[in-house]
Amino acid sequence: MTTARESARLSGAAWYADHVRLTIDIPADPTSGIRVTAETHIESLLDPGNELPPLELDGRGLVTHEVAVDGHVLGETEFEASPRSLRITDFPRSGVVRTVVTAPVGGPGDKGFAWRPGLLSTNCEPRGFRRITWSLDHPANRATFEVEVVADPTLLRTVLVNGDLSGESRTADGRLATSFVDDVPKPSYLFALVAGDLDVRSVDLDDAADGHALERLAIAAPPDLIDGADFALAIVPRIIAFDRATGGLPHPHRTLTFVAIPGYPDATEYQSLMFFDPAVLVADPSGHVDDDLMLVILNTAHEYGHHTRGNRVTVRSWGQLALKEGLTVLTAQNDTRRHLLGPAARILDVLDLRRLQFPEEVTIGAPVVRGEVDDPEALYTRTTYLKGAEVFGMLRTILGDDAWREVTTSFWERYDLGSASVDDFVEHASASVPAVADALRSTARWFGLSGRPALRIDTRHVGGNVEVTIRRTDSLRDEPCVGIPVALAAVGSNGPVASIGPDGRTATEHVIVLDSRESTITLRPDTGAGLDGTVVSALRGFSAPVDLDVSLSPAELALLVRHEADPVGRWWAAQELGIRAVDAHRAGTDATAIIAVLAQALGGALDDGIDDPLLAALLLTLPDEFMLGDREPMIDVDGVSAGLAVLRSSLGHALHDRLLGLLRAHPDNPDGREPSDIAARWLVEPVLALLLASGSTEATAVALSEYRGPHAPRALRALPPLAPLEADLLPVPYDDLLAEGWERWQHSPKIIDRWLRAQSGSRRSDTVQRVAALASGPLYDPTDRGRVMAVWFPFATRNRVAFHHPSGEGYRIFVDEVIALMPTNAGLVVRLVGDLLQFTRFDAGRQALLRRELERMATAPGMPDFAVGIVNGLLNQGPAA
């Protein structure tokens, strides 16, 4: 086992803090600053005999009142305090530093202490602890903590800190001193404190049988939100059970508390005490929709997973962030979603990657998954999280599920409560399973790859065999080539058939690791029947995050839509047919024949019966306009939009009666909050989008009936398809429909968020004006993360045809908001700006308008350095060819 000290030494650290005792004195007005006394036990990591370097502690914005070493108060000449560090030249090989400071409240990104009305909280990842006290604020350093918080209980009635409550006492002035002990060593970025007006709900967990320490799951929230904790209290025990069944380490604490903090930026997995924006933890008791429940599931799964995987072995440096975040997205977040929703949920992973991460690949600031940077905030990207998960997923595909479980379990055990690097994981896996070591190492080169490979797969039937040629078609210059695992199956009219792969193994699926620019393999029949009539399904399960082009005919793709057992392969074939139809329309050729093949394939699949409503919903969802546009050097906003409109209308006509029947076959369960209920409601929006595009009065009547239904989670799914309907097809004016919704749901903020999303994501010609009105109206609150996402996320990241209105007005109103938000919530803004970052890929008129807005961003006050650097880099590019 690699100890925490050994891990820290490998990071290059000369000093190590193994214990921290804090006294945090909160005044009646916390915004005036907080007095923090810290006693930090520090020792040298250098071998005896080596000259000791000065001890340098990290700090930001601290007012220093006293510095002492082993009880000796240092004079002004015995230490040097700068705005960024505290330097002590003559520090012994082992000693205790005592500092007394006033720490600021508020500041860049609300790091350190932050005050929100009624609540004081901390925000320490990645470098916030240095705004609380002088410290060795590095991720490889782990220390145990004792913390005493002194506060007026009439002002801050609930105090929570990492670890276990160890005592309470009254001070001489009548305030309450609350003490906590955390005996599990943690890096400083996992320190957490919250104090204020919070209620707590909890459930007991029975863990005696499996040796886990965790006995109690608690949720803390402001009194007006606490009734929404019931969903998380019900779903998180299932998440915990799944985590344990799939290799998570035992949780080290008796109590695990999730805290809803209004205005908190997203979610963070502080040790035993996790902080969340309420939108991703509590289901608003006044009303919520399925998206809210899914956010709770995904965020609680992700942050819990850190406790048993991604922070039990933390990162040796911030450049290795993907080790904790990518692995956690894969094994906690995505795997949990598939566990609860079924295999088709893998398609949702692919959609997230395409919509959120792929745009980062084409910007000048596109980060690699792993890399050292001056400001670790720059690493909190979709590339680190989502692409990082896919790279680890490729390693899992190569290893196979059983070997992956053994490798990860032994890795956690080896480095438990220490730190490691991505390379440590790769080498551990390679040593554990040497038969695939070369494939693992070649695939691990993805961690340093900027950009996305593209594959062309050609198949040829020869004498009962199938020859498969896999060829790289991208212009990336990775040398040696990264490994790309390609999962293949020969699919016939009864599903995948067994074949003999190039390794001599008989299976229905073969994984080929392409580690060159081109390779040809042969699949041979397992029986005398041969493989004639089969179709090769490639990249099953989305085995690698690449662009894929295939030589399959429309009829062959249709066979996959009908008979492929892998949900991703089936969905991809339907998407490919849709893409070809849109491209035909853009090229000015007749798309009728291709659309007919797709309609027949989808109709046949519906007639055969699709047991999983989520899979049915995703098969019926048209290709995403962002993915369609992003395939080519120049993004054809208008052509893609027009092609999708034709495809939508044609499928609506062809599948009309089947779609009506599908809705009837999946009626709503008004009380249903199970994942299966959510999956059934997923059907409503894509089915109505096709039906309404047919222009039938029956479709309009059904859509209005759905919208006026009694259950908001289903009713609101009908609003986006109704929004772009022409006035002559909609018997009720659109504004009247919106007014109906407002009348019903005005007292339910989460439902109103969905109501707003439907408007900002609409393809209506007046969407830009509507978004501007919403952003300047009384419903908008820029400090409310959920409300910001409701107005801007659909508009800027899901609605290219409206956002890129030729007037440029969409850009202007959006950049106004970016400039306002970036100084305090850069992490949120990063999720919204994908199209700004690829401005040179649009037509000349749009490029000029986008350039003007980027120039505004580059010179706006309060923009973080990393953002200014990215924007200036983009502006220094020449226009696209």
Annotate each language-model stretch with its function:
Residues 41, 87, 261, 313-317, ...:
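Conserved short loop/turn motifs at secondary-structure junctions
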Residues 46-52, 72-73, 167-175, 206-214, ...:
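Short, glycine- and charge-enriched coil/turn segments that flank and shape catalytic ligand pockets
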Residues 111-115, 136, 160-166, 192-195, ...:
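Short coil/turn segments at secondary-structure boundaries
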Residues 1-254, 284, 357-358, 371, ...:
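Acidic/His-enriched low-complexity segments
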Residues 421-441, 446-473, 479, 582, ...:
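His/Asp/Glu-rich metal/cofactor-coordinating catalytic motifs and the adjacent surface-exposed loops
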Residues 354, 382, 478-480, 524-881:
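Long, ordered, helix-rich scaffold segments
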Residues 180, 219-469:
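Hydrophobic alpha-helical and helix-loop surface patches within well-folded domains
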Residues 53, 61-70, 158, 435-441, ...:
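Beta-strand-rich binding/interaction modules
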